[in-house]
Amino acid sequence: MKTCQSSHLDSGVESDIQCRSGSGCVVKCSTERMESAAKRRLAANARERRRMQGLNTAFDRLRKVVPQWGQDKKLSKYETLQMALSYIMALTRILAEAERYSTEREWINLHCEHFHPESYHHYTGQKVATDSDPYAQRIFSYHPEHFQIAN
């Protein structure tokens, strides 16, 4: 004699229903198995939905801390990961570079050297007023001096 598993006992405990005629039990057992499979599928779907919601929330949080060039569209998951990787690598380079210099002052001087008078005119498209140009000396009384960074 065969025994069927009860649909309300998902723990695997066998019921007291014993089958004498095989066809009645097969129908009942297959129905119970289908109901059990449907319940498991619903539970798995709910777990997957929660997992995806958590993943999407994590991507949204990452998008908020990763710098974006334009705010016109939301970055895709792939773009978000690429930007996060680039951002982390840039920050790592900055930290590694800062460790190479013994003082904070040396690091600041390295990054501010392009602000010296002989080079900042190059960035603005202006030429430096020289002593040989009396017109420039008369018109522009201001003479740029070296920038100083306060400690």
From Swiss-Prot:
This is Transcription factor ATOH7. It comes from Gallus gallus (Chicken). Induction: Up-regulated by NGN2 and ATOH7. Down-regulated by HES1. GO terms for molecular function: DNA-binding transcription factor activity, RNA polymerase II-specific; E-box binding; protein dimerization activity; transcription cis-regulatory region binding. It is found in: Nucleus; Perikaryon; Cell projection, Axon. The keyword Transcription regulation applies. GO terms for biological process: axon development; circadian rhythm; entrainment of circadian clock by photoperiod; neural retina development; neuron differentiation; neuron fate commitment; optic nerve development; positive regulation of retinal ganglion cell axon guidance. The keyword Ribosomal protein does not apply. Transcription factor that binds to DNA at the consensus sequence 5'-CAG[GC]TG-3'. Positively regulates the determination of retinal ganglion cell fate and formation of the optic nerve and retino-hypothalamic tract. Required for retinal circadian rhythm photoentrainment. Plays a role in brainstem auditory signaling and binaural processing. During retinal neurogenesis, activates its own transcription, as well as the transcription of CHRNB3 and BRN3. The record marks L42, A43, R49 as: Required for CHRNB3 transcription activation but not for DNA binding.
